[in-house]
Amino acid sequence: MTRRTTQIVAGNYYHIYNRGNQRDRIFFERENYLYFLRKIRQYFRDAVVVICYCLMPNHFHFLLLVLCDDFSRRMQNLSNSYAKSINKRYNRVGHLFQGNFKAKLISNDAVLLHLTRYIHLNPVFGKLVRRAEDWEFSSYREYIGLRKGTLPEPDVILDQFKEFREYQEFIVSYQEEHFEMIKEYVLE
């Protein structure tokens, strides 16, 4: 196993992501997405604060405040458990993920804010939906009050706005130049 270049240190924010081996799917049906979210709760209860997330057919994104010292081990256990389950369910063999998960330390609040937009707009960028709120497997619906959730803690971000509608406006106001601020923090 290769050594992680970004050490995960409790008390910091990270963009955590990974994709399918050879960019193949990691989620094949609705139940897979829900199962993965249940696994997140199982492996990371009291170990992280989930700021936002998005599960895409062939990759995932989490923006987290890490609270534990054994995050990498927990993430490895989660990935292995999920991969074994998918391989068994679909009669597959081999790697599900393209190597170890990636982690980018978030350097400031502006990057944290803009990364939430990037993560929530991922299904739109991927042409899976026309509007971010139409994608079921992201935390955006919790952010704008369309769904009550227990996984994300949107107040970390929403407290920067007078009301969630301002956050909605922030999301839809995305311009290509906003990507420049965060490009070093996203999928390689």
What are these regions (language model features)?
Residues M1-N12, N18-I51, M56, L65-E188:
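Short Pro-Cys-Gly-centered "Cys-loop" motif that presents a nucleophilic cysteine in a tight turn
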